[in-house]
């Protein structure tokens, strides 16, 4: 597949912008494997189209098990639909692809962020990482991140057998930094108010947005 497809321009005011979570906005995190036995990539992209149409704060294409070339091809498709709905597109893991696509941001595992030279972290958009301790939060600040994802906060099928870190950890993480902190792990409409009350800037949802009723639209349009 050719990756030279033209990307429609994004409105300048929407670039690099994650809306405040007090309005009920969430970051959508992808998992294409949820569609392995349910329509494959075409169904995955169709669902993402629905998610983007509901105007989440951003879409993170978290398909880090792919080869970078294949990831870039898929990322371009996802970026196109994000731009169509004026939703920020955040790449995951692959800094080279993020730069070539002029992504609105890049999310890196902290282990990968540590090994990246400072000039490699100089991206045009947001830079984020995932934190699982207060030490991670401090390190992420020093490495130049502009937002953090903290988790996992609640029990989730994505982390079977691992106890959640809970709202206390989220509260401490949010209080320890001026950076916006987004909660991940078991985020549902019912739990969003708890996350915000703990000081988080918002939440991230994967399985609950990629499958079943699309509750994001109701959250974004109260």
Predicted segments, located by residue:
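Conserved N-terminal beta1-alpha1 strand-loop-helix module at the mouth
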Residues: 1-107, 111-113, 121-147, 162, ...
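A short, polar/charged loop-to-alpha-helix boundary motif
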Residues: 112-117, 156
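Active-site-adjacent loop and "lid" segments of alpha/beta metabolic enzymes
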Residues: 160-164, 183
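Conserved acetyl-CoA-binding loop-helix of GNAT-fold acetyltransferases
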Residues: 166-168
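Conserved donor-binding loops in enzymes that form glycosidic bonds
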Residues: 186
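Internal alpha/beta core interface subdomains
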Residues: 200-202
């Amino acid at each position: 597949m050719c990756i030279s497809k033209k990307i429609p321009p994004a409105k300048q005011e929407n670039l690099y912008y994650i809306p405040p979570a007090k309005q009920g906005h969430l970051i959508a995190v992808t998992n294409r494997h949820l569609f392995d036995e349910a329509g494959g990539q075409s169904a995955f992209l169709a669902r993402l189209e629905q998610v983007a149409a509901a105007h989440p704060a951003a879409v993170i294409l978290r398909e880090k098990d792919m080869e970078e070339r294949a990831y870039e091809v898929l990322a371009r498709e996802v970026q196109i639909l994000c731009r169509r709905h004026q939703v920020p597109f955040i790449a995951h893991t692959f800094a080279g692809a993020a730069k070539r696509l002029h992504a609105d941001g890049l999310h890196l595992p902290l282990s990968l962020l540590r090994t990246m030279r400072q000039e490699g972290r100089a991206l045009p958009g947001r830079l984020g990482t995932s934190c699982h301790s207060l030490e991670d939060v401090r390190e992420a600040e020093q490495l130049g991140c502009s937002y953090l994802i903290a988790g996992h906060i609640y029990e989730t099928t994505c982390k079977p057998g691992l106890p959640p870190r809970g709202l206390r950890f989220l509260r401490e993480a949010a209080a320890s930094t001026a950076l916006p902190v987004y909660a991940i792990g078991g985020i549902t409409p019912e739990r969003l108010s708890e996350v915000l009350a703990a000081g988080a800037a918002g939440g991230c949802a994967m399985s609950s947005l990629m499958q079943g009723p699309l509750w994001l639209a109701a959250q974004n349009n109260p």
